[in-house]
Amino acid sequence: MYFCAKKPIIFKELITMSTGYNEKQAIFTERELQVTADGSHTLFVPSMDEHYHSVNGAVQESAHVFIEAGLHQLAKKEIRLLEIGFGTGLNALLTLLDTEEKEKMVTYYSFELYPLELSLVEKLNYGKLISPGQADLFIDLHRATWNEPVAITPAFTLHKMEGDSNRSTLPQNIDLVYFDAFAPDKQPEMWNPEIFKKLYECMNEGGILTTYCAKGVVRRTMKEAGFSVERIPGPPGKREMLRAVK
């Protein structure tokens, strides 16, 4: 059952991050827990004026952009998947539930520079909203140890990598990429030509990359990296999105 939006809950947390140059910088951030149009939660970062998901529906956006436009386009029974931006773990949860139902084997790699605190994760309603009988799986995704493979189920192995994908070696033989960084105008360093070249090189022939973004500059950058790129209908509230194929 969906519910009405209430006053946002504000969480403050002190995050120590690596700039990539062996320096440590303490950043004080606020993340506001908000309810989107489909009843599912998202997080809002006031300092960036940016949401983790579409306010028109977090679950609907994730399902449309990554599951329907990406995962469902693969006929393979064994899938190697790379996500740029683990975030709230919503994409991972939807992928786990979808592939378990279809008896597929998934190795799920995901980069995240700013992992969420478990105390905040436990407030998110995805598990109870999407699959109440399997709600614990969502928490299991977040409790999984970083920087090593963890079998969440016999058919779903999660390998979360804490760090910057721009400065990291990417896993190889990838079939599907979920590109879910913050928007280009908020996090431009994540949409540079080098990252798309690295992604192209790590993917198998016929591999698919999907993202919610449909900006012309992003499409051109993907094409320059070697991808065949198409604009396809976007999720509720967004006319278009991009799908790229190697």
Q: Which residues does each PLM region occupy?
A:
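Rossmann-like AdoMet
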Residues: 14-79, 97-126, 130
